[in-house]
């Protein structure tokens, strides 16, 4: 799914003058004077978008079928969001796939805890771009 989103994010970044980091460790933003939680510094992220010392972690996942992974990811991303927000970051999760038709409780849990969750259709309609404009303004 990163392959699908990378060109979309590159267009948003180019249009608004943001910086993008793809498949980098969180510590990459230390060069931009960003605060990085110690527990995340050496972890890789799908995307980081940066502008004016504001940072957004974007994680993307596609799940074709049921399993324990989507449940673990929801809990993990809720915890990550809290840790990032404590350090001045924002968090966006882009997820899609048939698993969410049968894992509605986990999806509801995610919507109750995470402000920015999008599927591919929402991204294509421009909601990700709007969210980034609001967050990075």
Language model regions located:
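Active-site metal-binding core of divalent-cation-utilizing nuclease and nuclease-like domains
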Residues: 21-52
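Catalytic cores of nucleic-acid endonucleases
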Residues: 62-105
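Structural alpha-beta junctions
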Residues: 14-18, 84-90, 112-118
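Acidic-basic catalytic patches of nuclease active cores, encompassing PD-(D/E)XK
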Residues: 1-33
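Hydrophobic, Leu/Ile/Phe/Ala-enriched alpha-helical segments that form helix-helix packing faces
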Residues: 5-13, 80-85, 136
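Conserved catalytic cores of phosphodiester-cleaving nucleases, focusing on short active-site segments
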Residues: 47-51, 56-64, 77
